[in-house]
């Protein structure tokens, strides 16, 4: 099961303690996934479609709890793609259904919503704002597995509703943005801290902990990778330097013989040939008294300069300081 599905299953079990919060959450769910059917004699019925069984059960429970109307759940099987079940929560035409439309800002006689965005009365309190956000996420949201890229989004087909969702999230200091995607509008968050705050607002506390643990693990893994890469780079640099030093020393040995070098350079060359993998510090400790790392490096550089001169065609007439 995806991280997004696990998060939705958790949120589907969250029940608002106040009627106003339950109404706000239901309004968001219907706004995201609901559609109105009109039959003869202007009889209205309401269908709410979701692919998540837990969300369907929540919609059913909220409708029964808030309005007490006859409600049914139908299951349909998709015939394409992943062939997931589709759950349809249906409220058939009956007396009292107008109360649902009224609560959502829908007038049956006009065949349209009086407010394309969020009905402001539904989110008058902070608790209701959080509940509406939870409902919107359950109805059209998703969140990436935190082991990958950080991304949370809510998709709606209404531009005004998308903008209202952005403003709702910004009210809670979440820097949400909206982007068009074909015939849809995507409200999204990118930062890990922002997503954690959003999960907390919606009361997805278990998902939040899983997200945080995955983020910490990912951070540690990335840090280890950086350290390993750094160590590898340093090791490669050291190995390349040692190889170059050995090449210079062998060149001098073949060209003029190491015995013609001044004693400090001769000893340095011989120690390097004897200990090709040793660091400069380790080489320096072979002398009595020990020679510092900078001193060994200075001698190595003299050997390198001499080898370069001889490679350029110059004759060797004894070692002279530059």
Curated annotation (Swiss-Prot):
Molecular function via GO? DNA binding
Q: Which Gene3D superfamilies match?
A: Homing endonucleases
This protein is called what?
Answer: Probable cell division protein WhiA
Which residue ranges carry the DNA-binding annotation?
Answer: 279-312
Q: Name one GO biological process term.
A: cell division
Pfam families (UniProt xref): HTH_WhiA, LAGLIDADG_WhiA, WhiA_N
Note the SUPFAM superfamilies from the entry.
Homing endonucleases
Q: Which family does it belong to?
A: Belongs to the WhiA family.
- Native source organism of the sequence: Desulforamulus reducens (strain ATCC BAA-1160 / DSM 100696 / MI-1)
Q: What NCBIfam families does the annotation carry?
A: DNA_bind_WhiA (TIGR00647)
Q: Which residues cross the membrane?
A: none
Q: Tell me the keywords, alphabetical order.
A: Cell cycle, Cell division, DNA-binding
Q: What does this protein do?
A: Involved in cell division and chromosome segregation.
Q: Which InterPro entries match?
A: Homing_endonucl (IPR027434), Sporu_reg_WhiA_N_dom (IPR018478), Sporulation_regulator_WhiA (IPR003802), Sporulation_regulator_WhiA_C (IPR023054), WhiA_LAGLIDADG_dom (IPR039518)
């Amino acid at each position: 099961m995806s991280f997004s599905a696990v998060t939705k299953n958790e949120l589907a079990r969250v029940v608002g303690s106040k009627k106003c919060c339950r109404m706000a959450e239901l309004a968001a769910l219907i706004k995201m996934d609901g559609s109105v059917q009109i039959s003869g004699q202007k009889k209205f019925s309401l269908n709410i479609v979701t692919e998540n069984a837990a969300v369907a059960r929540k919609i059913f429970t909220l409708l029964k709890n808030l309005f007490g109307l006859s409600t049914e759940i139908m299951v349909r099987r998709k015939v394409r793609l992943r062939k997931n079940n589709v759950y349809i929560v249906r409220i058939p035409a009956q007396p009292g259904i107008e109360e649902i439309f009224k609560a959502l800002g829908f007038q049956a006689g006009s065949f349209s919503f009086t407010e394309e965005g969020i009905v402001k009365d539904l989110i008058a309190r902070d608790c209701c704002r959080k509940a509406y956000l939870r409902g919107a996420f359950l109805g059209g949201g998703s969140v990436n597995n935190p082991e990958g890229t950080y991304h949370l989004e809510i998709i709606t087909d209404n531009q005004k509703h998308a903008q209202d969702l952005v403003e709702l999230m910004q009210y809670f200091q979440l820097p949400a943005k909206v982007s068009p995607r074909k015939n849809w509008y995507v409200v999204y968050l990118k930062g890990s801290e922002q997503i954690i705050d959003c999960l907390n607002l919606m009361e997805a506390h278990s998902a939040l902990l899983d997200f945080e643990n995955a983020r910490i693990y990912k951070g540690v893994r990335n840090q280890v990778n950086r350290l390993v890469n750094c160590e590898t780079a340093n090791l490669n640099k050291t190995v390349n330097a040692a190889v170059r030093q050995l090449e210079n020393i062998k060149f001098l040995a073949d060209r003029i013989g190491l015995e013609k070098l001044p004693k400090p350079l001769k000893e340095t060359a011989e120690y390097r040939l004897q200990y090709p993998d040793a660091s400069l510090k380790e080489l320096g400790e072979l002398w009595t008294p020990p020679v510092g790392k900078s001193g060994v490096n200075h001698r190595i550089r003299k050997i390198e300069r001499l080898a370069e001169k001889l490679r350029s065609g110059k004759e060797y007439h004894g070692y002279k300081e530059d």
